[in-house]
Amino acid sequence: VWSMGGFGLLAPAKDQLIWSTLAGSLCFFLIGLADDLFALSPWPRLAGQVAVACAVWSQGVRIGAIDLPWFTASAGPIALPDSLSLLATVVWLVGITNAINWLDGLDGLAAGVAGIAAVGLVSVSFSLHQVAAGFLAAALAGCCLGFLRHNFNPARIFMGDGGSYFLGFTLAAVRSWGPQRGSRR
């Protein structure tokens, strides 16, 4: 099935980004699961998140350029040196992940926000011919929307830190290598 369509038709570079994103998502899930089971203090969680973010950055999941419309209208995006790319990527991945985790306090809020963001990412990804990002965002949107049915008030199931870390990281990672204005990678 993998080679008959979908991800099997993507370029090997995109395949690497997909696997790196999914490996990072699994690692973030495991950090969150460990927090759910053992009530980790914030510093070990943050250290683990930064380590995983650095690892996926080394595999190509990175913010390589920043587009400032008021500054780069004619010049295009500003390419970041590796040190700034690493810093921007780590702040983005860890920041979005923790933002989604903070939203998980109310029934349906984290999954609803992440689902809406993923649907928007699907639309933008496919309109820019970013098929790999579109497929991953569509899968994430489907997960969120399927979960929401059981997570509305009164919630019957809960995402926990593992689920919210997975959602946040996957959303942030797909956005970091997925749709970029004017690109057709």
Where are the model-predicted features located?
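"…together with the soluble PPM/PP2C metallo-phosphatase catalytic core" -> "…together
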Residues: 1-185
